[in-house]
Amino acid sequence: MIKILLATDSFNQVNGVSTTYKNILNVTKRSVKVIHPGMFKNKSFKLYPEVEICYQPLKVYFKIKKINPTHIHIATEGTIGLIARLYCKLNNIPYSSAYHTKFPEYLKLMIGLPTSISYSFLKKFHRSSKAVLVPSNSCKKELLKKGFDNLTLWTRGVSKDLIAPLPKQKKINKSKKIKVLSVGRLSKEKNIEELCLLQDKFEITIVGDGPQYQFLKNKYNNISFLGYKFGKDLAKIYASHDVFCFTSETDTFGIVIIEALCNGLPVAAKNVTGPKDIVAHKQNGFLGSNLELSIIKCSNYNKTNIKKIARKNWSWRNAEKMLFDSLLK
């Protein structure tokens, strides 16, 4: 009998990793057990407060032993992931893993740690995995150059409750400001302040929270900061804007990009890993180094066509199949 365990250091937070696995669990017909830091004593990671660090390794190990899985998917490289990997190695359990986040780049930005050290750790962590799931082709190419093995592409999806009916599209009046939306964590590595600097050029709405929330809200008075929004409320916000702006240059994917596209929003972003794997330049968005220009360029793209094509391309059921096929093959 197949018994699958999902081991993750990120499950209760609002981020792309948690969103991915919760949606996978919502659509799967398989029986999957989950182990995460919220089940044990934990502390927040100082550099990334939303991440919980579990400090009860023996309890985690014996919890896994009690579940007695035949296959394990290790979602993250934190303490839960490390203990799950150790369990697999000691008990000859097949496992797959996933690469979600460019933590080496984050750590270099935050504390100056050379990326070579972090990537050396990650390479060793994923070395025995039967399949290392990556979110995009450009991410896969980057990791191959760094010496990673067994890389497998893993797509994402969008939930139905995050898709709202499109209002009738009108050509944007040049005398009115373009309505620009950004959704995500408000922190230094997300580069959101580059968009904030354009507060006098566009009507900007920012959805999300994080370490920079209060700082940005106090500094940029012409921007609407809404905090976290979910489900249908978030879908309505997507549908009521003209352009979605994705500012990060260090993400491996960007689920919010496909959420925006599935609501018909053209995307303005940098030509970097993540956006360039999702956005068709000059078709459903504009990729370039100048965010202001990119926003203006894609502001009158056909939202109905963007939405129609995006909804065909992104499915959680397809993502679920890819995840478990790679684990059970």
Per-segment meaning from a language model:
Residues 1-40, 321, 328:
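N-terminal subdomain of nucleotide-sugar transferases
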Residues 20, 35, 120-166:
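Donor nucleotide-sugar binding/catalytic pocket of nucleotide-sugar-dependent glycosyltransferases
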Residues 126, 228-229, 236-241:
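Short alpha-helical donor nucleotide-sugar binding micro-motif in glycosyltransferases
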Residues 173-190, 196-205:
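Conserved donor-binding/catalytic core segment of Leloir-type glycosyltransferases
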Residues 214-232:
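Nucleotide-activated donor-binding/catalytic signature segment of Leloir-type glycosyltransferases, i.e.
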Residues 249:
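Aromatic "clamp/platform" in nucleotide-sugar-dependent glycosyltransferases that forms part
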Residues 266-269:
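Short hydrophobic beta-strand element within catalytic cores of glycosyltransferases
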Residues 293, 300-329:
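A charged, aromatic-enriched C-terminal amphipathic alpha-helix characteristic of glycosyltransferases
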